[in-house]
Design a protein with these regions (language model features):
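Alpha-helical transmembrane segments and their immediate juxtamembrane cytosolic regions
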Residues: 1-279
C-alpha cells in the first residue's frame, strides 16, 4: 500500500475543496460504500451460518469497525479507499495554504512514529492517514527527479541493503512493525522500494496483461475479497477437492471474475459503482 499512496501523489493537482470532495467521493467513497455493503452481506451470511444470534455483531460491531478501523468485516481491505480520500483532502487543503511539501512529510511521519512508539492503534487511520500523507507528499515532490540515475542508484542500493542486512517493514493499515525490525529502516525501505519499483517499470516493456490490471486496479481491489469469501463458503472438503486445486481456483477467480464483472459494469449505466463514468 505504500506504493499506491506514493504513486497517487505523483498525479496531485491543486483543486477547490468542493471539487476535490466531489471527485474523491465519486472515485473512492462510492466504491467503498457499495462493496463494503456487499462484504457486510457476505459476513452476515457467515454469522448466520455459524449460529451467531447476538444482534450486536450484526449492528454495532460493523459501526465500531468502521469508526476505529476505517472498514468493516467482509471486505475490510477497503480501508485504503477511506484513508486515501482523507489523504487527498488534507493534502489539498495544506497546499492551498502554501504549506511546504517537505514540512508536511516531516510532521506526518512524526505523527506515525509517535503512534508507533506509544502503541496508539485506534483509530487506525490516525497513523495510516499520517503515513499516507507523507508518502503522497513524497510522490508529489519526487515525481520527476526519482528517475535520475543517481537517485535511483542510491534508492536501489538502500532497498537491497535493508532487505539483506536488517529486513524491516510496516503493516501500513495498523502501523505495525515486523518482529526484530527497525521502524526508521522500514520507512526508508518502503520509500526506496517505491522509487525502485517505479524505475523498473519505467524501463521494462509494457505488458498488456499488467497494463490492463493497472488501468482497472479498482475492479480487482474492491472485488477480490468478495470472490475469495464466496469461494471459502463452498464445501470443498465435502467434495474432496485438494487444497492445491482450491488455491488454483482462488487465483484464477481473482483474476477473471473482477475483470468480467468490471467489464459489464463499465459498459452499463452502473459504471459509477466502480468510481468510473460511463463512456
Amino acid at each position: 500500500m505504500f506504493w499506491f499512496f506514493f504513486k497517487s501523489g505523483e498525479f496531485f493537482r491543486l483543486k477547490e475543496t468542493r471539487a476535490k470532495l466531489i471527485g474523491g467521493g465519486k472515485k473512492l467513497l462510492v466504491p467503498f460504500i457499495v462493496f463494503s455493503f456487499l462484504g457486510y452481506c457476505l459476513n452476515v451470511y457467515n454469522l448466520l451460518k455459524s449460529g451467531d444470534t447476538n444482534w450486536v455483531h450484526y449492528v454495532l460491531t460493523p459501526v465500531k469497525e468502521l469508526v476505529l478501523g476505517g472498514s468493516i468485516a467482509g471486505n475490510d481491505v477497503l480501508w485504503f479507499l477511506t484513508s486515501l480520500f482523507m489523504v487527498q483532502i488534507i493534502f489539498n487543503e495544506l497546499k492551498k495554504r502554501n504549506v511546504k511539501s517537505w514540512l508536511i512529510v516531516i510532521v506526518a511521519i512524526s505523527i506515525a512514529v509517535v503512534c508507533h512508539m506509544f502503541d496508539i492503534t485506534k483509530p487506525a487511520y490516525l497513523a495510516n492517514v499520517s503515513m499516507g500523507i507523507a508518502l503522497y507528499s513524497l510522490g508529489y515532490m519526487l515525481r520527476d527527479i526519482q528517475y535520475d540515475k543517481k537517485i535511483f542508484g542510491v534508492a536501489f542500493a538502500a532497498y537491497i541493503a535493508i532487505m539483506l542486512i536488517e529486513p524491516s517493514h510496516i503493516d501500513l493499515r495498523t502501523n505495525t512493525l515486523n518482529e526484530n525490525g527497525c521502524y526508521i529502516l522500514a520507512l526508508l525501505f518502503s520509500i526506496c522500494g517505491c522509487i525502485t519499483v517505479n524505475n523498473i517499470f519505467k524501463h521494462i516493456p509494457h505488458l498488456p496483461f499488467l497494463t490492463y490490471i493497472g488501468k482497472n486496479s479498482m475492479d480487482f481491489y474492491v472485488m477480490h475479497m468478495l470472490v475469495l469469501g464466496v469461494i471459502t463458503i463452498l464445501p470443498w472438503s465435502e467434495w474432496m477437492i485438494p487444497n492445491s486445486v482450491v488455491f488454483g481456483v482462488m487465483c484464477i477467480a481473482c483474476l477473471t471474475v473482477p475483470a468480467f464483472i468490471g467489464y459489464l459494469l463499465e459498459h452499463s449505466r452502473y459504471s459509477w459503482v466502480l468510481g468510473k463514468t460511463n463512456k
